[in-house]
Amino acid sequence: MQAKNLCFYLSDHGFGHIARNIPLIAEAVRRTNGFVYVVCGKRHLEFAKANLLELLTPEQSSHIRYRAEHTDIGLILQQGTLLVDTAALTDACAQYLAERPERAKQEADWLRQHDVAAALCDMPLWSISACEQAGVTLLYVGNFTWTELYREFLPEHIWKAYAAEYQKIQHGMLYALHNPEMLEFLPRAELSETSLVARPFHPDEIRAIRAQHTCPVVFVALGMSAQFTQPVSVEGVEAHFYVTEGVPLTGSNVTVIPYSTLHTQDYVAAADYVITKAGW
């Protein structure tokens, strides 16, 4: 077993990025004697740590180091809608890009100080330049880049600045169902395609969820970007709804799943129907 330090740079836009990397982090820990650093948002790291404590032994878990950072902008939506707030997103991305050079420089210093041999990037733009400056091999793992999304909404100088960073990537692993448009922005990358990844399911928990209901079970998630203020009653609907926080459904047949819930994947597996946005 090799003793190499690794680092995961993960988007804190929603919980999909951290969730899909939990199995990868666990496997990385099992395969190295070095430290595995995980850089993401504070709540995201709390979620990851709780999951990884279940997947790994205490000795293995002791090899993980968590570092809380706001890593990504993602999308900003108009309140009460799923429409992009172009003005707010433009301002946020402009500030993010202005901070990128200094942030990348500081991160490159950190990578050298911690003797990181390789990094995995799932979205955060500044980590690409940081690894390039530090001479650290970076693997981009994902199913899209922000560039092909942002060019639909943002000024050209912003999405092209994102494109310039993604074009530095030399190694990429693309999930099944990845956005074909992303290939345009990875011209230098040696790419491989893989399947999908998910946290393990728990059959007993799935059966217990289903046993509570004789009606259809519906899972609803609209992501962390959406902020709704107008409630929608589903009281008369012949179904039970499990919803993530922020989904505005109300009624005695609605159960809200807190962000602190470890195994949201079991609610998905227990559902007869899933209503969601185009996320992980």
Task: For each feature predicted by the language model, list its residue ranges.
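Donor-nucleotide binding loops and adjacent catalytic segments primarily
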Residues: I25, R199-Y273
